[in-house]
A protein has these predicted regions:
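Conserved beta-strand-loop-alpha-helix hinge in the C-terminal portion
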Residues: 157-159, 165-180
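Extended, small-residue-rich solenoid/repeat segments and analogous flexible loops
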Residues: 1-36, 40
Length: 180
């Protein structure tokens, strides 16, 4: 994997970025002037980071695995020690699909109904492969989301969730906290 150098990261034009960043040259970054990256972050091949005007912040010690899309028009905040597995899509904005309006970016704004709400991912969260996270979701500290899940609602801390749509499966151990 080929990663950007510190000089190349400066030229991308991030609002702010920390140290020890491993960002693949095969990732795509849109509107970097509104993206804040902390320390010790790895972003793998074929990821998309697309910021709007709302907060788009990745704190420290975060891994964004290959093929993850972060659509941040409504804002995305990912707190420290969180990880997102391959193929997951995180949407802070979406059209409404209830049939009361038209959908898609090629339709005039007045004919659309947009849902725009920030995604908050607290510390120690892990999201499995190929999940979809919808606008307005807050994943509280320590949440784990199983692979192929539809995350259409917020999740209480230290729970393991899965399914489409998600449901609480069981409590998650907090033993990992003793490792820090």
């Amino acid at each position: 994997m080929s990663f950007y150098s510190t000089e190349e990261l400066q030229n991308i034009g991030f609002k702010l970025f920390g140290m020890n960043l491993l960002i693949s040259r095969f990732s795509r970054i849109y509107n970097p002037k509104n993206i804040v990256l902390g320390n010790n972050i790895r972003i793998d091949d074929f990821c998309i980071l697309s910021a709007g005007n709302e907060a788009f912040i990745l704190e420290d010690n975060i891994h964004i695995s290959a093929g993850v899309y972060l659509y941040g028009t409504g804002g995305i905040i990912i707190k420290s020690y969180s990880n997102i597995s391959s193929g997951t899509k995180v949407f802070s904005v979406s059209d409404t699909f209830d049939g009361t309006c038209l959908v898609g970016p090629m339709v005039d704004e007045h004919l659309r109904k947009i849902v725009k709400s920030p995604i908050i991912i607290e510390k120690y969260v892990v999201i499995g492969a190929n999940c979809v996270v919808l606008p307005g979701v807050r994943l509280e500290e320590g949440v784990a989301i199983g692979a192929n899940s539809l995350v259409n609602k917020s999740c209480k801390e230290w729970g393991i969730y899965g399914g489409s749509p998600i449901k609480l499966l069981k409590e998650r151990s907090k033993d990992l906290l003793s490792l820090l």
